[in-house]
Amino acid sequence: KALSTLKKKITIIDIVDKYADQSKCEKIGDLEYESFLNTGDENFDWKMPEDEWQAISLSYTSGTTGNPKGVVYHHRGSYLMSTGSAVAWNMPNRLNFLTIVPMFHCNGWGYPWTIPMLNGRTICLRNIDVKKIFELIDKYNVTHFGGAPIVLNMITGAPESDKKKLKQKVYVLTAGAPPPSIIFKKMNELGFEVMHVYGLTETYGH
């Protein structure tokens, strides 16, 4: 219905998510995401932006603290956010980063740019599963990850059988509404050091 109100036709790309309830999924586009990626040119001649203020991405927010809106990120802002995060979060060179925040959430809070800047390794988590989180932390010696407060709730409230003793301290960044103090306490007892930051789409996620 929303698309029918547009004066100009736009390209819609459907994402087929194997974790989603297919009975509730409806394809409304002409392209599927993986098929769309296959149309890319491996020999594409990449060009650097001519101006640091040029757009790098467009993020939409449902308006948790304001009206729904689209937010244009530019290269300068993304660079400053990346370097600022590295300093504020004390992120070392060649760290192992577990990606939990999805790209549709402020571009994964900008860490797809920050981690390469630090020569880091990104470990991808397609579906939020506490047991899998602990397994990946153990297998890849994960040192950092970001997650919304609900992720911290899931970790602290998971059955003991899903948890693993951490081999090293793991630094966690969470943004948005502050989690209850008991969540910070429980995360600390599990070996996580949590830093809470201000979450806002207009400020690149935090």
Residue ranges and their predicted role:
Residues N38-N43, E52, S57, V71-P92, ...:
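Conserved structural elements of the adenylate-forming
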Residues I13-D14, C25, G29-L31, L37-Y60, ...:
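Conserved pre-ATP/AMP-binding loop-to-beta segment of ANL
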Residues S35, W89, M117, V142-G147, ...:
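Gly/Ser/Thr-rich phosphate-binding loop
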Residues Y79-N96, F104-H144, M154, A158:
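Conserved AMP-binding/adenylation subdomain of ANL enzymes
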Residues K9-K18, L173-T174:
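Short beta-strand elements of ligand-binding domains
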Residues K1, K69-V72, T99, R121-N127, ...:
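Short beta-strand->loop structural element characteristic of the AMP-binding/adenylate-forming
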Residues A55, T61-T64, F97, M103, ...:
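Conserved S/T- and glycine-rich ATP-binding loop of Class I adenylate-forming
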